Swiss-Prot record:
GO MF assignments: ATP binding; D-glucose binding; glucokinase activity
Location within or outside the cell: Cytoplasm
Main location: cytoplasm
Catalysed conversion reaction: D-glucose + ATP = D-glucose 6-phosphate + ADP + H(+)
Name listed for the protein in its UniProt record: Glucokinase
Organism: Neisseria meningitidis serogroup B (strain ATCC BAA-335 / MC58)
Binding site for ATP: A16, D17, I18, G19, G20, T21
Length: 328
């Protein structure tokens, strides 16, 4: 992150969620008021600075002094080299080039975690559990392109998001079927992380492993095709795949809830679950989530929410920027 000593946190503020394919930009024009959202293809711009300038010109924004970018990358210092796109840049040099007083960067899933604190009840669908305990830790997990994992803990300064790489922890198979699937993945990849299964590619991997177990040679299917055939009843194998995927998610989510003591709730982000909402309510997820022996009652009380807001990375970046400006 980079700032000059400044002291008035003015609006509008520039907020962005930058992935390998698209960069989403918006202006925060007042506290929690997000306007003029736009999506720019990353491939159309040589540098992140070019993309920012194009958005600012398009939106007609003037006098922007503060900005925050959520980005699909670990943030380990001033230099950012995107892992899934060619953009590489210095945060401080970018701040100076754009004439900003403040520019902060944060991991995209850390931003999604912070967005949970800004999300209204209409953008949450509860799946089991009771009421959240106020100010208790919250767990945030998001199967999508990869598997994002974070947590939120409350401090005197507000909610703090935990930045980590929990999606790459080792996956724990629960039953004999999952052991077979895990063995298939281990033979293929060596280390089997939670993300190997709990992602778009992971859904395809579970499908592939089940087909191999049945000595079948099914057609190659995209994750969206697997879910479509599972929900329509067109493929029992796809339905079994989706059931196992949701059960696996229940295991990993409950492990995270126990680790954090997340009596403030578990929040499911990412692009996969919102596409199968009605199915998910009665999927194996919740029963697996609670299946923890002596801690079954503890987990049964924890509410799980599916986050439905469209651009959580944007609102999370705005929350991070606000926290930063309050504390400089």
């Amino acid at each position: 992150m980079s700032s000059t000593p400044n002291k008035q946190a003015g609006y509008p503020r520039l907020v962005a969620d930058i992935g390998g394919t698209n960069a989403r930009f918006a202006l925060e024009t007042a506290p929690r008021v997000i306007e003029k959202a736009a999506v720019l293809p990353c491939k159309d711009y040589d540098t992140v600075t070019d993309a920012v300038r194009a958005y600012l010109n398009q939106s007609g924004a003037t006098a922007v002094r503060h900005a925050a970018f959520a980005i699909a990358n670990p943030i380990l210092g001033d230099w950012v080299q995107m892992t899934n796109h060619h953009w590489a840049f210095s945060i401080e040099t970018t701040r100076q080039t754009l004439g900003l007083d403040t520019l902060i960067l944060l991991n995209d899933f850390t931003a999604q975690a912070l967005a949970v604190t800004q999300t209204s009840s209409k953008d949450l669908m509860q799946v089991g559990g009771q009421k959240p305990v106020e100010f208790a830790p919250k767990a945030v997990i998001g199967p999508g392109t990869g598997l994002g994992v974070s947590g939120l803990v409350h401090s005197h300064a507000g909610w703090v998001a935990l930045a980590g790489e929990g999606g790459h922890t080792s996956f724990p198979p629960f039953d004999d079927m999952e052991v077979l699937i895990w063995q298939y993945a281990k033979n293929k990849y060596g280390h089997v992380s939670a993300e190997r299964f709990l992602s778009g590619a992971g859904l395809s991997l579970v499908y592939e492993a089940l087909a191999a177990k049945q000595k079948a040679k099914p057609a190659k299917l995209m994750p969206s095709e697997i879910t479509e055939k599972a929900l329509s009843g067109a493929s029992p194998l796809c339905r079994q795949t989706l059931d196992i995927f949701c059960a696996m998610l229940g295991t990993v989510a409950s492990n995270l809830a126990l680790t954090l003591g997340a009596r403030g709730g578990v929040y499911l982000c990412g692009g996969i679950i919102p596409r199968v909402l009605e199915y998910f309510k009665t999927s194996p997820f919740r029963s697996r989530f609670e299946n923890k022996g002596r801690f079954e009652a503890y987990l049964a009380a924890i509410p799980v929410y599916v986050v439905l807001s469209e651009f959580p990375g944007i609102s999370g970046a705005a929350a991070a920027l606000d926290n930063h400006l309050r504390n400089v």
